[in-house]
Regions:
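Short, flexible loop segments at the rims of nucleotide/cofactor-binding pockets, characterized by
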Residues: 23-27, 55-57, 88-90
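Active-site neighborhood of HAD-like aspartate-dependent phosphohydrolases
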Residues: 1-47
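Non-cysteine beta-strand/loop elements that form the S-adenosyl-L-methionine
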Residues: 5-11, 74-80, 136
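Active-site flanking residues adjacent to catalytic metal/cofactor-binding acidic residues
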Residues: 8-10, 50, 115-117
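A short, structure-level motif marking secondary-structure boundaries and short turns
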Residues: 19-22, 51, 82-84, 107-108, ...
């Protein structure tokens, strides 16, 4: 498997609970920085891709999030600051952030992977552009797979991982295998 880039959701995937936590207070899981470094060591671009509607409410800024993602080692961050009620094309499950990344970095999105914890947003956005889909069971992941499965029933994840690090190890095994 030739992977050009990996997109990673924030809340519930790299840390937190799945709920909004301001970047100044957000703590990544103990393995998240290692997972990002493994991708970088294998020359795989790593992008944060997150809905953060609290920006539109003035509770945080794009700069707050960009600094956070840069400190973790992400190559870039694609952040939707809008609420789900706004008529934007970037709020997941719409694929606007992925399309923006594709244009900016000349990516073939069918050669990318999306790692996230929410089936009805992360997995649907990935599916819309033909990206591989990895659902992690942290954050909302377990609930997405069980009680909320009907909201994305027509989509199957390519892999279900216990967490972000396991997802990255699966990607690397497919690249090397």
């Amino acid at each position: 498997m030739n992977i050009e880039a990996v997109f990673v959701d924030r809340d519930g995937t790299i840390g937190g609970t799945g709920h909004f936590i301001h970047p100044n207070e957000f703590a990544p899981y103990s393995f998240s920085r290692d997972a990002i470094q493994i991708l970088k060591d294998h020359n795989i671009r790593t992008f944060a891709c997150t809905n953060q509607h609290r920006i539109s409410r003035g509770e945080a800024t794009l700069d707050d999030f960009n600094k956070e993602f840069q400190s973790y080692g992400f190559d870039d961050a694609f952040i939707c600051p809008h609420s789900s009620d706004d008529a934007c094309n970037c709020h997941k499950p719409k694929p606007g952030m992925l399309l923006e990344a594709s244009k900016k970095y000349n990516l073939d999105l069918t050669k990318t992977v999306f790692i996230g914890d929410v089936g009805s947003t992360d997995m649907l956005a990935a599916h819309a552009v033909g990206a591989k889909k990895i659902l992690v069971l942290t954050g909302w992941g377990y609930g997405s797979l069980k009680q909320y499965r009907e909201s994305w029933a027509e989509i199957e994840p390519d892999y279900v991982a216990e967490n972000f690090l396991e997802a990255v190890k699966w990607i690397i095994s497919k690249c090397e295998g």
